[in-house]
Amino acid sequence: AIRIIGGKASVIPEACVSCGECVKVCPAHAKKIRRDLARLKDLLSSGAKVYASIAPSFTGYFKGVKIEELTSALVRAGFAGVSETAHGAESVSAHVSRLLAQTSSPIVISSACPAAVDMIRKYLPKFAPFISPLPSPVRAHCRQLKEIYGDDSKVVFFGPCAAKKTEADTYSNELSLALIFPALERLLEEKDIKLTETLEPSMGFAEEG
C-alpha cells in the first residue's frame, strides 16, 4: 500500500490496513510506525484521569515481570490505574456466545483485530457483512473503565500491535491512545522507573481458565 510521489514513499490510505508490513519491507526504511509517546506525556500531564489497558501479551515482552510490578510502575509514571484488556475480551466472549446462538449467519468474523477487519472491508468486501457487530476487546474494556471511572476519564492501550492505533483514531471518544510495548518501555526509562518494586495493588485482572 505504498506509492512513490516525487521520489518519496507515501502510504495509500484507501489500500492501507495498518498491518505494518511496509515498515518491514521498505528497502529505504522510509516508513516508521507513528510514535505517540509525546502525546501520551501531554495526556498524563493534562490533569485528566488516565487509565492503562494492558494486553495480556505483556508477559512475552517484559520477561519475568509480574503484573503487580508493571501496575506499580505505571502508577508511578502518572496513570490513575491499570487494568488488563482481557476484561474486555471476557465480556465480548460472553456476548459472542449469545450471538452465535441467535444468528442465522453461516459465519461470524471476529472484530478483535483492526487490521483483519480493514483487510476484509477493503479487499474482501463480500465478507464484510459477516464481521461481528460487537466491539473489539479493547473497546469493550474502554467502555468498562469509563463506566466505572466516568466518561471524562481517558484510556490508553498498550500492546504488541500497531494496528490498534487505527482504533484510537476512529474511536477516540473511547480510546485516547494506543501504543506498542517499546513505547511503554521508553516511557519508564525516561522517567527512571524500574520494574522491580510493587507499590500499588492491581485494579483486577481476568481470571485464568
State what each model feature region is:
Residues 1-17, 21-37:
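Iron-sulfur cluster-binding cysteine motifs and their immediate structural context
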Residues 34-209:
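Iron-sulfur-associated redox domains of electron-transfer enzymes in respiratory
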